[in-house]
Structure formats: structure tokens, C-alpha cells
Amino acid sequence: MEKKTYSYDEAFNASLEYFNGDELAARVWVNKYAVKDSFGNIYEKSPVDMHWRIANEVARIEAKYPNALSSQELFDLMDHFKYIIPQGSPMTGIGNNYQIASLSNCFVIGLDGNADSYGAII
């Protein structure tokens, strides 16, 4: 089954609506995080599609363990970046069958001192 593709304008306009008119957020999402193949075909229309992709992939792994969260529960935690906020490479790579992407990223942790340093980043 062939997966639906979207034009840049379709993805941008849907993302613009998702981000309540924030053009920068919409452009960054389409340019950096929407799933694309090596030919530049766009397979996600908005961050809603991305959150479902990530939720479905995480739920697939979760199902192997007791008390697994469902795709819907995971989606609800991510939708509109509410609670779980994937960052950078993981946002592009999790569940992406079109490109190989790193799933690692840096994390900022709480510190008692100055958090504006290399020491605050793992």
C-alpha cells in the first residue's frame, strides 16, 4: 500500500493551523521534523501525524512489558507538546521507515548551580 504524500504547502498550512499561526514553528516543523524520504516526499501533514507515528512506535515496544500504555494514551501525552516532548533527532527518527536517523539527543538536567554550561548538558 502506497502511503499518502503531501505538498510543502499542504504540510505548511496544516502546521500553521496546528501552531496557531506561528509561521516560524510551522516552517521549522515541515523543514526539519516532518517525515520525508530521500527524494523529499513529505509523508506527514502536521505534528498530529508525527505524534501518532511516535505514539504507535513507542506503544509497539511498550506492549512487550506489563502495564503498557496504549497508542492513544501516549498520543494524548504528546499532543500539542503537553507532557512528553520528543526533541530533535528522536522526533524525526522514531518510527521513521524512510530514513535512517539517530535516536540519541542531549538532555538538560536540573542543577543547583549555573545551568548555562556544558556541565548541565549530558
Could you describe each region identified by the protein language model?
Residues 1-122:
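Extended catalytic cores of very large enzyme megasubunits
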